[in-house]
Amino acid sequence: YSKTYSTSQKARYPFLVHSLSIDLNNHLNAPRIDWMQRFVIFSQYRSAKESDIIIADYTLSYQKTIIKGGLNIFPKWADKSQQNFYYTKANSKPTLYKTNIYTGKQKKILSSNGMIVASDVSDDEDEILVTMAPTDQTDIYLYNVKRKKLKQLTTYGGIDVNGNFIDNDKRIVFVSDRLGAPNVFAKAINKKGAEILVHHGRNNNSATTFGNYIIYVSREKKDDTGSNTFNLYMVSTKTDYIRALTSSGRNQFPKFSVDGESVIYLKQYGNQSSLGIIRLNYNESYLFPLSKGKIQSIDW
């Protein structure tokens, strides 16, 4: 077996190594690891009111700043090909933009008097779930990008955030404080009622989905350092089984890989921050230390 790998950009050498690993892995008929070649996109704070949007490889060896100047937060890939992404520019009137990573072309999508975040993209990439607070409280909205049509999905008087598609985009899960503490709920897109989805933990404040699987963040008891632990758990809409994915530290911002076989997340343990990857089908996990800067949010 032989193949030549080359690039005109020295900074992209890590992707050559990833390509070599993927090809060798496929040649040996081992489980596919195509996720190695995908970009990670994240928002990193520079100061209290300034953050950049950066793309990187999963080891963070390659990094390139795409958006800078002002407070740029909550990047979310707009397509599986990773050519475009959504992000929020938090200025006097928070605005959601769609940007091409290669051309830099930007398109204004929506703006709001309060918070606005694109949290998930439909499988056909035509619709997005948006957390928005046009008045006081946040609710979940469905926005058709092609038709420019906005539909409000939740109307609770408290906090509804972090909407994600499940079950072939027919339902959504979201985080709400409607029972007091934050927890994960589900509802059909075309129906009003919502049901509690997670019966484990007292403070479940974030979630990500793939198909009928949900990974959520649960705040738990304090660890040896005196800090609260935030652990990741996986559940399915089809069973009652709960799978623990982490057991120590502060584990947050989980995101499924495009094939659903891996999850990326941020881990804080003591004074060390790392980007973590869990291979769900193989009980393998990896940590890649963050050298500097606090990450605001991440997508894969």
List PLM regions with ranges:
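Residue-level detector of Asp-centered blade-edge/turn motifs that repeat once per structural unit
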Residues: 31, 35-36, 79-81, 123-124, ...
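An edge-strand/N-cap motif at the start of beta-rich repeat modules
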Residues: 33-56, 63
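Short, solvent-exposed loop/turn segments at conserved positions within beta-propeller repeat blades
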Residues: 46-49, 90-93, 133-138, 177-182, ...
